[in-house]
Design a protein with these regions (language model features):
Chain A
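Conserved "HGTGT" condensation-loop signature of ketosynthase/thiolase-family condensing enzymes
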Residues: 1-175
Length: 175, 375
């Protein structure tokens, strides 16, 4: 069996929930989406200023990994359904791809977007998927994200890793 | 060195029942499977219609009382393994698309569902779980194909399973996305929205070398695939279908197929005003003047929308179209939308299909395309 080629970890970030976590318009009920977005901003820079994803476009993919995703919004949607009155905004807020759509829009990323559920280490799994996506030439850069919510909101966190195909000898000489 | 990827077996489930015969009889005759939902209360919703299987008529092998998503995936997986004649399931990784639910209604996490399916079938590793909404099963198939093409494995089981449940139904109802008239009419001027449907399919994807070594017969070749994002809006598709166009264009280019070689497209076609218009516009951008030659149908008009599993169900429908040289119609299409005209299949048509696309899109601007070629 084949061993997949190596990739280069360009930069990483980890952000935690708390009073300083910026809100994300449209995602007001849970820290899940704000954590994912803040991790991206911490990792690659603010979308409105100079950032590492500028000009990447369709060469950039996003993979989000989590065990249970946005359990806060999901549980809220259950409460709404049980009450017989569901807020329409929950329709998209419970979907894991929604925040990725916002990240893709703000950073102009038009490549593949995936969400993967895990039982173990989400970061390891996301990076393994990134390795395969890069090997398949589905993208040249991958933004790998993980989000972990916790019953204690202060323990919730997100990670972001920007990876790319490992530069060959010629690329290394130039840099 | 990259391997060619083939489909050597599949298992399928829909509101029409288990197996390809039931699916073919229903979808390819254009018979909608919608009926009144009885598994939970829908009296307060815009519609009570969904394509749910008649519980008394369907009993998959070794299913317990009440059909569950896991049982659907297991039954489809077993069908696929048997059809392919694959001997040792322990050699097969699995990639499953499934739903994400609150722990209070679904104690088992999505990846634990995959583990249970894999354990029951005796499958190997890796075991992966995609949950990117309506593109999840297409993504699962694409990921499985990537594993085979990269040489990570000789074969893999990939697909998805979904049963209409109270949570999904109520969320779609709250967004006024369900068709109040109880009809899912893709690309029709009078379309009112989507209807949900039970569905599942598992495909055994296998390298050409493995198929030759086993002296097995491939069903179709998975020629190429592509995923894109609209980079436009969290919940709405790009009005001109930019992401759809990019996915179709990339899938064709990667396979070396030109638009004039494409015969059939199984569209995402949810019957919602925004989605169908965007998809039709995207097809025009990608196919140009060849758009009027390519047959298009929206088979959710008969099966309903199986959400996370829809890409696998529709890949199998596309495969059946190629194998039978019969195109499934879009049911209920009476007044086609004229803004971006397509060559609709309104009645079953006998056509040779050397190349066909299956398309899906989801919330967050995600688009996925897989291109099947005759084996």
């Amino acid at each position: 069996m084949t061993t997949l080629p190596a990739f280069e970890l360009v930069t990483s970030a980890e952000v935690h929930a708390g009073p300083e976590l910026p809100q994300l318009p449209g995602f007001m009920v849970s820290d899940f989406a704000p954590l994912a977005y803040a991790a991206v901003r911490e990792c690659v820079g603010d979308a409105r200023s100079g950032h590492l994803l500028k000009g990447i476009g369709d060469r950039g993919g996003i993979i989000l990994g989590s065990q249970r995703f946005d359990t806060v919004t999901l549980e809220l949607s259950v409460e709404h359904v049980n009450r017989g009155r569901v807020s329409p905004i929950l329709f998209y807020q419970v979907v894991p791809t929604a925040v990725l759509g916002q990240i893709a829009r703000d950073y102009r990323l038009t490549g593949p977007v995936s969400c993967v559920a895990v039982t173990g280490d989400a970061r390891d799994e996301v990076l393994e998927l990134a390795r395969l996506l890069l090997a398949d030439q589905g993208a040249e850069w991958v933004l790998g994200l993980t989000v972990k919510l916790d019953p204690d909101p202060a323990k919730a966190f997100a990670t972001a890793d920007l990876v790319r195909i490992a530069p060959g000898p010629a690329d290394r000489k130039e840099s | 060195m990259t391997a060619k990827v083939y489909v050597s077996g599949f298992g399928v489930f829909s509101a029409f029942g288990f197996g390809p015969e039931a699916l073919f009889d229903g979808v390819f005759s254009g018979s909608p499977a919608f009926r009144m939902v009885t598994r939970f209360d829908v009296s307060h919703c815009r519609t009570g219609q969904a394509a749910t299987y008649p519980e008394a008529a369907v009993s998959p092998p070794d299913a317990g009382p009440g059909l569950e998503t896991v049982e659907v995936a297991i039954a489809c997986g077993r069908q696929a393994i048997e059809m392919a004649g694959w001997r040792d399931p322990a050699e097969l990784p699995v990639v499953l698309a499934t739903k994400v639910r609150a722990p209070s209604v679904e104690p088992e996490s999505p990846a634990e569902i995959t583990e249970r399916v894999a354990d029951r079938l005796g499958l190997g590793r890796p075991r992966r779980t995609f949950v990117n909404a309506c593109c999840a099963a297409t993504n699962a198939i694409i990921h499985g194909a990537q594993l085979v093409r990269a040489g990570v494995t000789d074969a893999v089981l990939a697909g998805g399973a979904f049963l209409v449940d109270r949570q999904a139904f109520n969320l779609f109802d709250s967004a006024q996305a369900l068709a109040a008239d109880g009809q899912l009419r893709p690309f029709d001027q009078d379309r009112q929205g989507v209807l949900l449907g039970d569905g599942g399919a598992m495909l055994l994807l296998e390298s050409g070398e493995s198929i030759r070594a086993r002296a097995a017969q491939p069903l179709v070749r998975l020629a190429s695939w592509a995923m894109t994002n609209d980079a436009f809006h969290v919940a709405q598709p790009h009005a001109q279908g930019a992401g759809v166009a990019a996915a179709v264009t990339a899938a064709l280019q990667r396979s070396g197929i030109s638009p004039d070689q494409l015969t059939y497209i199984n569209a995402h076609a949810t019957g919602t005003p925004l989605n169908d218009a965007a998809e039709a516009a995207g097809l025009h951008t990608a196919l140009g003047r060849h758009t009027e030659q390519v047959f298009v149908s929206g088979t959710k008009s008969t099966t309903g929308h199986a959400l996370e599993a829809s890409g696998a169900l529709e890949a199998v429908i596309t495969l059946l179209a190629m194998r039978s040289s019969t195109l499934p119609p879009t049911a209920g299409l009476r007044r086609p939308d004229t803004r971006h005209p397509l060559r609709h299949v309104s009645v079953p048509e006998r056509v040779e299909v050397p190349y066909a696309l299956s398309l899906n899109s989801s919330v967050g601007g995600v688009n996925a395309a897989i291109l099947l070629a005759a084996a």
